[in-house]
Amino acid sequence: MTRIFTFPALTTALTLALAAAALADDEYNVSNSLTLTGQPLGMHGVDPVSMFEAEKPEMGNATFTSAHDGVDYYFASQAAQATFEADPTAHLPQFGGFCAFGVYVGKKLDGDVRYADIVDDKLYLFVNEEIFKKYLEDKETVIHGAHAKWADIHHTPVSSL
């Protein structure tokens, strides 16, 4: 009897874990590889706190990992991890880490930390230098339009856009 109970329990747990990862993949810009905890990796392993507090983005370390909404984030230090854990949403990029300009035009494109802007204490990422320059021409319109569009595409799979 124990084996019969254990197998369905393990199957259910695995199904739920995979469903959470699949959901995160559609709503967050995550790396395909899984972390040591089995969850997808956010911001390509870059420390989200460093985007606000360091001179340049810093790569995180798996030693300092924190999960938020089914996604793991790496941090450069224990202090950065603690800062994040005190208020995760204050340090995460808008639109799940997808390119803000992409969201503005109804797409979920990769967000690259090399092309980032912080406006009103909110982090916005962009897919490349050309798109970032286009955004700089009319920041307010792009940000406002992206926030309006996000409600429509937030739960839409990337492959459907």
Task: Briefly describe each language-model feature range.
Residues Y74-F75, Q81-E85:
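Mature extracytoplasmic domains of secretory-pathway proteins
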